[in-house]
Structure formats: structure tokens, C-alpha cells
Amino acid sequence: MRSLFASTGRGLEELLKTELEHLGAQSCQITQGGVYFRADDKTMYQSLLWSRLASRIMLPLNEFNVYSDLDLYLGVQAIDWSEVFTVNHTFAIHFNGTNDVIRNSQYGALKAKDAIVDSFQRKIGQRPDVAKQSPDIRLTIHLHKEKASLSLDLSGDGLHQRGYRDLTGQAPLKENLAAAIIMRSGWKTDTPLIDPMCGSGTLLIEAAMMATDCAPALNRVHWGFRHWLGHNEALWKEVTHEAFARFREGKKNTQARFYGFDVDKRVLDMARANARRADVADLITFTQGDAAKLTNPVSTGVKGTIISNPPYGERLESEPALIALHSQLGRAVKAHFPGWRLSLFSASPELLSCIQLRAEREFKAKNGPLDCVQKNYLLSETPSTINTRLAEDFANRLRKNEKKLAKWAKQQQIECYRLYDADLPEYNVAVDRYGEKVVIQEYAPPKTINEHKARQRLFDVISATMEVLALRSDQLILKTRQRQKGKQQYEKMAEKGDFFLVDEFGAKFWVNLTDYLDTGLFLDHRIARKMLGEMSKGKDFLNLFAYTGSASVHAGLGGAKSTTTVDMSRTYLEWAEKNFQANGLSGRQHRLMQADCLQWLSQSNEQFDVIFIDPPTFSNSKRMENTFDVQRDHIELMKHLKRLLRKGGTIMFSNNKRGFKMDHEALANIGLTAKEITQKTLSQDFARNRQIHNCWLLNHAGEE
């Protein structure tokens, strides 16, 4: 009997222990990442050939303490290496772990290599060669604190490499993890199995190999034991011949059928090639198709299992599409697969919640560095087309707001308006409509809120919004709103360049919902812009901190004699120029100026009749010499504005600072008066948030 160790993925140890015991292993003991066991040579070979779950199977050679690099050298040299492999064969050492003495794994591997080479040199006067790629003998040393374990890797390459998969789609599952998912799914080998997002076909191929009693490593060519002097070739041939016979018989007798769907034709071609190499292609039907439109390819009355590893998404912008995919998959399986089993493996339990089913069992496992969950569901015997709504309170409020505001917006000739603005504290988002598209802005949750809970609520909101507003996934854009720092407000978030025109009181504006944190149009200033248009006929108009120049466009359309648009961002000024062009405004009377607004204001001597200024609440941009705080600095700001304001002129001053207090006394001292008009500038869609901005009209004293 030999002492052996089988490694596996985290979370699969118990499954591996059961599998090894079924293969005849004895004295199985679970440890983190694997199972120690004892086996005779036949069981050892069967474990290598038949284990669907093991990553590698090792033959321990020695254990020793390492208090110095000499201890490592002597511990490795204690083995008579001429009895392990011949000098004509290459070897490699995989060293992992460090301690206070061996602080570098490469150094550890080098010392171990020296020990083996010196051992051969002393005994037979020759030395074997090291081969980092495809060595004949692969040795592993694991060092933990002072304890080192030295093993011969009987597998060679990892056992997940079955030999059938040369090409893979994006983010493939390792074959041994796929096998574990199938084992845990509740699938019975004589029933149909469907993967609606099959990718390169790994789950279906592994299942087909189980159904046909095919040893998972039957197609492997390279093994780590081939040049080991303890290898029994006759016994190995006996074990493999038995396996081939079992596969022939199993393939002849299986009744199981497998169905794979994917939207990517290229990946399906890979899947078909993989299935051919595994010799199970005749059992699997691969079809190009969308999981969201999944229907049942199996005869009525036959029940099987749907299994999949759906995409989970790393980028924020992909989440609406993934939420839609999971929601639509949930509807499809409930409608077309009564009485079937469903098993989904994912790195995102929040996305799985969009299926809107209660799992009867859950398992945890690692997929590389990712913490994943597998959820098993039993679908109702009664087909259902009704979805239980997530975030019901939010959905009801959104539905009510949409009904009220859509009619109002049409009457007002506006295409962009706010549908929801954190009306309910537990759903802390804003929902804005831009024509046929909708933007959800998530306000960054407090650190006290559990991250998974916040993410789950956001997913519920997205799912409910898509359902209530009947949106396709490409019509919904997700943003996270947080405090802007430095140049962040000017930096691109994406490179889509997806601009489209929207209408506001007859003015046309280009908006971009994806590339920047903001969209190009501040919706809460809509009425203020309209007022500026009405105030500017025949007047010289100045727009400071102008953003994309929408207020200037309204002034121009309102008949302004001239418009001057000042902003520090070249990007936004180019955007403003497009807005002018979209409205037929051109000529030297419409100036666009790139400048630090505060610096420009302090240096300019021009005169204007109407001035609009909407400064940031706070700014410490590197392109500004000093910091700016709107509460602290608004009087200094007004001093400069007064100098540029003609007699009889008006300043419209707006800002977003909550609790802003105008210093009327200081204003009077510089010869200005101010009247708050905030309530007049709040339109119906912002009536629920009266602190979205504050707005003032200022005039020279005695002219109000």
C-alpha cells in the first residue's frame, strides 16, 4: 500500500473523499485543498485515470524540517534518486512556500535541484537535465513554516486537462470543477441535460463522459509516472483496457441526451470540436440561441436538468444586461420546463436572485480566486409566466411617478426628466429618463451598509425598473454617484462616443449617457434655462462654469444679442459647440472660451446684461490656483460679477450646496440685492427634492 495525496479545489474536498473511497482508496483523510489516502498500485492507477475531481495525485517521498538551506539540501538528498528515475530523463521542481530561511521559492527550487544533481553525480558520475517545460519527472516541494514535504507528481500536467479541450471561450471552467458542479446538481445520468449558455461545452462534455462511463483521463497522453522507476506498465495497461471497455459499453447503452445553446457561433464551433475529441459529439446537440429565449427541445413529459455557469460581469455597465439575462432566463425556465431541475453556478449570488426562485440547496466553491455559489432549484410542475416582483415598494412608486410625469413631460415638450429621486430611503437611487433611455444613478451607500445588501438592492432596483418601464437592457445605463475630486468630473468613464439629441422646450441638446459621470444636461436647471432664454432677448449674455453650454443655447434661441460661454474644460466646450450647431446658432456673436472661470472673472472688463453662474460647491482642481468654497467665497465672487454687470442687468446665481445661506448684509455693502427664486425653478419632477439646488436673482442696489 502506498500513501498518496490528491489535491482539489477549495470546497470540493468532501466530494473527492467520497469519489476516492468509491475507487477503492483506504484511510482517506480530508485536509484543506485535498485528501490523504492509501492505495495499492491498481487503485493508484485507477485514481489517476478515473478521478473527475482531483487536480493532481502526489506520491510523498520525504518530510523534513528546514531550519537552514543545508537542511533543505540534505532533506532532498536523503532520497536515493537513482531509484526514482534514470539520469537520461529530465526533471523539474515546483517549489511553493517560504520561511525565515528560504525566503524565495526560486532559491528553494535551486537548492533542491542541486541536491538531486549532486546525488546522481556522486553515485553514477552523471547528472540529469532540468526541463522547465514538459519534464519527464515533476517533483513538488511544499514548505510551511519549518516543515517541508517532498512529493513525486504522478499526474504530470493537472488532471483537469483531460485532453479534449484545446480551445476555450471566455472565462472557462476547469474540467474538475465542472464535474463537481454536475455531481452537485442533482442530475440523473439517464435524463436530458441542457446548458443554455454552454460556451466551449465543458459542463455538457463532462456530463456526457459520466453518462457513458468514460474515464475522464482516458484521452490523456502525458503522465508524470511514465518515467518513474516504480511504474508498472503492465498494470497500467490492464487498468486502461478495462476503462476503454467500460466506455464502449457505456456509450452503447446510454439513453441520455445533451443540449447546448450559446449566442456566439465561434464558441459553439469550439464546443463541437471539444466534443469530437472527447468522442461524445453524437450525444450533444449544440445550437446557436439566446438563453433569454430558451425553449424546451425535449419531448413533452420528459424531465431533466438545466445547468449553467452564467456570465457575472466585472464592469458596472454590464450589470443591466446581466440582470436582464438572468430575469429572462428565470421566466423562460418557469414557462417551458415544469418539473425540471435547475442548477446555476455563479460568482454573483445577487444576479442569481434575479431568477426569482427559492433554492432548495446551495454549495460553495472556488473558481480560481473567485468565491462562487451553486444553487439548485426545483421548478414547479405548473408552467408560470408570472414573475414575483422584486423591490415591490420601489416598483409601485416608479410606476406611479411614470404615469404622472410622462403626460406632464409631453405637454411641456421635454424628453428628459427625473422619474425617481431616492423617494424611499432603502432604495437610494435616482432614475432619469432621456428619451427612450433611462439612467439609474446609485448614490454611494454609507460604509455602515453591508456591501452585499447594497448590491442586492441595486440589482432589485435595476430589475424592477426594466420591468416597470418595459426596457431592453441596452436602454438602461447604470452610474454610481459619489463626490467628484479634482479632474474627475472631466475624465472619461468609457469610450463609446454614444451621443444622441434630446428636446427641451424646443431646444436640442446632445447628451451622452455612458462616457462621463454626468450626461451633458443638468435636468434640475431646466426651468432656469428657460427663464434665461426669456430674459436674454436683445441682451449680452454671459455663462460661467458653463458645462456644455445649454443655458447659452437657450439664451441664443431667446434672441440674445451675444453669448459668451466660459468653462475650463475643452471637452465640454467642444460639446457646447455641437449644441450651438444643433440649434442653428453660429457666428462671432456666440463665443466659446476655455479658461479658469474665477481667474477670467477677475481679469475681464467686459459688460453684460444677463449673467448666469452655477459654480461647483467646492473645487480644488489643479488647474485652479486656490480652492473654492461657494459658501465661503460667494461674496468675493459677487464683487467680480457686479463689476461686469451693466446697469439694469441681472445675475442668476445657482448652486447645489445644501443649507446655503446668502450673506445679504455683505451683498448690500457691495451694492447688490438678492431675491431667492428656488421654488420657481423647481419643476414637477424635482418637487420631491426641494434641496436639489438653490437659485437667486441679483441686481444692482436700487434696481430690483
Swiss-Prot record:
<feature type="domain" description="THUMP">
    <location>
        <begin position="43"/>
        <end position="154"/>
    </location>
</feature>
<dbReference type="Pfam" id="PF01170">
    <property type="entry name" value="UPF0020"/>
</dbReference>
<dbReference type="GO" id="GO:0070043">
    <property type="term" value="F:rRNA (guanine-N7-)-methyltransferase activity"/>
</dbReference>
<keyword id="KW-0949">S-adenosyl-L-methionine</keyword>
<keyword id="KW-0698">rRNA processing</keyword>
<protein>
    <recommendedName>
        <fullName>Ribosomal RNA large subunit methyltransferase K/L</fullName>
        <ecNumber>2.1.1.173</ecNumber>
        <ecNumber>2.1.1.264</ecNumber>
    </recommendedName>
</protein>
<dbReference type="Pfam" id="PF10672">
    <property type="entry name" value="Methyltrans_SAM"/>
</dbReference>
<dbReference type="InterPro" id="IPR054170">
    <property type="entry name" value="RlmL_1st"/>
</dbReference>
<dbReference type="InterPro" id="IPR004114">
    <property type="entry name" value="THUMP_dom"/>
</dbReference>
<dbReference type="InterPro" id="IPR019614">
    <property type="entry name" value="SAM-dep_methyl-trfase"/>
</dbReference>
<dbReference type="InterPro" id="IPR029063">
    <property type="entry name" value="SAM-dependent_MTases_sf"/>
</dbReference>
<dbReference type="InterPro" id="IPR000241">
    <property type="entry name" value="RlmKL-like_Mtase"/>
</dbReference>
<keyword id="KW-0694">RNA-binding</keyword>
<dbReference type="InterPro" id="IPR053943">
    <property type="entry name" value="RlmKL-like_Mtase_CS"/>
</dbReference>
<dbReference type="InterPro" id="IPR017244">
    <property type="entry name" value="23SrRNA_methyltr_KL"/>
</dbReference>
<comment type="function">
    <text>Specifically methylates the guanine in position 2445 (m2G2445) and the guanine in position 2069 (m7G2069) of 23S rRNA.</text>
</comment>
<comment type="similarity">
    <text>Belongs to the methyltransferase superfamily. RlmKL family.</text>
</comment>
<keyword id="KW-0808">Transferase</keyword>
<dbReference type="InterPro" id="IPR002052">
    <property type="entry name" value="DNA_methylase_N6_adenine_CS"/>
</dbReference>
<dbReference type="Pfam" id="PF22020">
    <property type="entry name" value="RlmL_1st"/>
</dbReference>
<dbReference type="GO" id="GO:0052915">
    <property type="term" value="F:23S rRNA (guanine(2445)-N(2))-methyltransferase activity"/>
</dbReference>
<keyword id="KW-0489">Methyltransferase</keyword>
<dbReference type="Pfam" id="PF02926">
    <property type="entry name" value="THUMP"/>
</dbReference>
<dbReference type="GO" id="GO:0005737">
    <property type="term" value="C:cytoplasm"/>
</dbReference>
<dbReference type="GO" id="GO:0003723">
    <property type="term" value="F:RNA binding"/>
</dbReference>
<keyword id="KW-0963">Cytoplasm</keyword>
